């Protein structure tokens, strides 16, 4: 049996397309890449479980060693779609140029699994006392289906978890959540010369937007976490469309907005705040306002600054532990054990044409993962 080299792992991960999308014409599942990972993990001595959550949507859990506790290294195997016309390189070919690996998933984040496998190869596991787990999930880029399902159904109880999203190898112990809703107003169209014959959806939406802006100001005043660069929840009105002509009363209008709650603000609590903000408008215009989520809400996440994993990882990386404003699978895996986000590459490369991972991350990442394995599995 020939164990692949690091670059070969990377090449095969990138060349095996695993796009997830809410657009069915793009969505292709992750089965092929999961089965590749399964074979590699088995070749390195791991026990492997694969679970199909929905058709073509798979989670993998690999286990090396036995005992209680241990370390969970986690990541997602799906990528976003891409615009071929904006890429200078083939998204599904690992291209070496400018001291970088180019390709879809090099940074976000299929490439992380190549680092895990390479670190495993570099360690003598003879005196291992606690298990190492590897979790590879599906659909992080859309619904976070894989992480949600795993956290709700697994029986494993690791001591700590590291999620390998691109953080420039800076440890992350917290991030905000994300809630996005559509508000649809149905009015009654008519000729603009006689407003009494219609119900203007744009005018109702104006009342809704005013109420949401009041809530935005309330969130800024009432919630504060100094651990974040933007220390309050944000509310953004991101998209609006309504009407079709200046001489027609607008019959329909739709607004999309998002909220990024701080850790500690429950999703139910936030939903109640949003509904309370619009209560008066809904009572004034019964049956004309419909609110629907644009995706499953993601809660905020925070690992205690006093957790031993925070101190351990900060020492190994030689960097202070920070917080960020984007989302990961951490809120779900944090339910299992203290969880940090730490991985090679920059979040600025995520979802971008010519996504890349700089070669300068290779040796430090393998070194950090090896040290984490030694510290928490021996």
From Swiss-Prot:
It is found in: Cytoplasm. Transmembrane segments: none annotated. Its cofactor is Zn(2+); Co(2+); glutathione. Its main location: cytoplasm. GO terms for molecular function: acetylornithine deacetylase activity; zinc ion binding. This is Acetylornithine deacetylase. It catalyses: N(2)-acetyl-L-ornithine + H2O = L-ornithine + acetate. PROSITE patterns: ARGE_DAPE_CPG2_1 (PS00758), ARGE_DAPE_CPG2_2 (PS00759). Pfam families: M20_dimer (PF07687), Peptidase_M20 (PF01546). Homodimer.
């Amino acid at each position: 049996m020939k164990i692949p080299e690091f670059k070969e792992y990377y090449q095969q991960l990138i060349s095996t397309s695993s796009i997830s999308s809410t657009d069915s014409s793009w969505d292709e599942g992750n089965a092929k890449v999961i089965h590749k990972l399964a074979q590699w993990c088995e070749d390195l001595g791991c026990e492997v479980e694969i679970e199909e959550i929905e058709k073509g949507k798979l989670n993998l859990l690999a286990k090396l060693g036995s005992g209680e506790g241990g370390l969970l290294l986690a990541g997602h195997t799906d990528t976003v779609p891409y615009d071929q016309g904006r890429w200078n390189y083939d998204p599904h070919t690992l291209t070496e140029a400018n001291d970088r690996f180019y390709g879809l998933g090099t940074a976000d984040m299929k490439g992380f699994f190549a680092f895990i496998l390479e670190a495993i190869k570099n360690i003598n596991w003879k005196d291992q006392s606690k298990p190492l787990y590897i979790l590879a999930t599906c659909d992080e880029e859309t619904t976070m289906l894989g992480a949600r399902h795993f956290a709700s159904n697994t029986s494993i109880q690791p001591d700590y978890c590291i999620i390998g999203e691109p953080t420039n190898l800076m440890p992350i112990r917290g991030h905000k959540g994300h809630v996005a809703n559509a508000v649809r107003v149905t009015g009654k169209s008519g000729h603009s010369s006689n407003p009494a014959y219609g119900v203007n959806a744009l005018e109702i939406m104006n009342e809704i937007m005013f109420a949401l802006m009041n809530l935005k100001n309330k969130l800024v005043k009432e919630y504060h976490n100094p651990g974040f660069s933007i220390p309050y929840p944000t509310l953004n009105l991101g998209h609006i469309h309504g009407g079709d002509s200046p001489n027609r009363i607008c019959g329909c209008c739709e607004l999309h907005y998002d909220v990024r709650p701080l850790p500690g603000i429950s999703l139910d609590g936030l939903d109640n705040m949003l509904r309370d903000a619009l209560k008066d408008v809904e009572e004034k215009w019964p049956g004309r306002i419909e609110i629907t989520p644009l995706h499953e809400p993601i809660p905020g996440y925070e690992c205690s600054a006093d957790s031993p994993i925070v101190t351990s990882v900060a020492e190994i990386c030689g960097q202070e532990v920070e917080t960020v404003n984007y989302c990961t699978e951490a809120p779900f895996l944090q339910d299992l054990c203290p969880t940090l986000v730490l991985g090679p590459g920059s979040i600025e490369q995520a979802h971008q044409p010519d996504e890349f991972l700089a070669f300068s991350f290779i040796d430090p990442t393998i070194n950090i993962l090896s040290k984490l394995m030694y510290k928490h599995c021996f």
